[in-house]
Amino acid sequence: MIVWQALFVVYCLFTTSIHGLFQDFNPFANKNISLKFPSLNRWEKNVMATGQQTIINSDSIYEWTPILSNITAGKKDSFVFTIDAEASGYGFAPTYEVLMFISGNICQMPMNRSDVDLTIYYSFNETVLENPNIGQSAVFQDGYIQALAISPVQSSSSNATSTYSNLYVVAELVNSTTEQPLSSSDASENWEYRLSISENDLVFQWDVRPWVEVLDTDMNSALLSTGNVTADAKVYHNYSIYDPSLYDLYVYSYEDSVQLNQNYNLSLCAVKNGPYLVSSQNTSNATVTSNSTNPLERTDLAIQKKITEYGGSVTEMFYVTGLNASTTYVAYLTKKISNGDGLSSVGGILFSHVYFTTRSTDVCSLIFGLDFCSDVAYSVPTSSFSVGNKTLMAQTYDHIAEALYANFSKALQLISCDADKDARYSPVMTCDDCAEAYRDWVCAVSIPRCTTTSSQYYIHRDKSHNRNDYLNKFIKPLDDYYEILPCIDMCYTLVRNCPSDFQFSCPNDLTTEDLLYQSYNFYMDTDYSTCNYIGNSSLMVIHPLDDT
């Protein structure tokens, strides 16, 4: 998106019109464009006397209020968009061209109709309303459409006006092979769609990235996290404000998602109005605050969300509860966009979906939100002392790690952390860096990550023979499990960040191979976790796959 915006600025400086170029090229294909400027332009429904026109709304419809229409075979929807050159792009566009962003979604359509396309025709020539073929066209694909219409600007000493006054748009169902309009004899099937035109942004957008990661699951819950949302914050001097309503998550059953992906894979409207099981948009008390009941105790079908620091960045987490065991679900992430005056309730961005599967037993329990080990957000061996009480279980694990950290904290106080740089143990690292590295490491080795899946990268743990005696005594796992070993990178970070006085060292695959692979593993670029990492994930090194 940044590359496109930069190219657009350069382009505007060296050309006076790209209207002709756009006849055969749509530069917005597979792009997520975001040019957020306010405008007061409006749609006007074109009411014609011919019998084939459909009046959707006889009133004016303003920008950022997409058309919602139902269309059948043999009908045409037609619109007129009034162009306002002075209001476009905060004064940049009037010097060159006025851009009109066309975008839309199919919300609902008949099943198995790959032989029919919903096509949009647009032109500055009014005769397109009678003869759509004279205009440019764009077809809804996977439930989504985006196109760009460009009007040159005529400048004078007093003002700048668009060469054209109106953009005319026609929507029609056509045969996908012949591209001919369908006859009214097929009018029994209904298509519902939304369409928007803006001089400042694509109201409907999609992003090829998932932008949400499945952190882990247990038998009846799942934890997902967005990417870094720091750029979405409102910054005020020395603090930032994050809006938890910016992102929402919709969870579908696998079966319903198959149908959704066949026809509406890129349709925000279809996802938000489809047969989803649960959504953070519709869950009561979805936003978790400091005064909220502990989210780990919620068991009904719901999604709770919270802005949090995780893995060295700020993300929004979604905790999904009330799920069935051994079941595959599909999650769709959406994002609101700005209309210039704040977040808009219409339109937005749809990201690529992700899959997750719950576990078959309660051998592992998903915990997060710990006080000391705040970056722990994964499944751990279920404690036989607190079955059904994740809050108590999380506190027990947290207290074990904090107790192990206490002696190290006292030893670190003996280091001259506040001395001049030339007298410190490192001119680059500080005692705070060392303390953080040790905390992450001790949390990872004392709070094992649990899975029920066998892998060459995982270690099988007997319920009575765990990584350390603290787990045997204070946790007593419910059953045998597989441990996802800590990433060796955390040990490397510990050695690098702490004073040599501690004589920390890490096992290696040359002299202590057995010790290495019994205690740690490497991070591999696979579709599942080969090791467990806590802390700033940007410090991780991706190692080549081990084919052995």
Swiss-Prot record:
Residues 1-20 form the signal peptide. The chain crosses the membrane at residues 342-358. Changing F356 to L/W/Y: Substitution by hydrophobic, large amino acids does not cause lethality nor low Ca(2+) accumulation. The keyword Translocase does not apply. It is a single-pass type I membrane protein. InterPro entries: MID1/Yam8 (IPR024338). Calcium-permeable, cation-selective stretch-activated channel (SAC) that functions together with CCH1 to mediate calcium entry into cells. Required during mating. Together with CCH1, essential for tolerance to iron stress, which leads to an increased oxidative poise, and to cold stress. This is Stretch-activated cation channel MID1. It comes from Saccharomyces cerevisiae (strain ATCC 204508 / S288c). The gene is MID1.
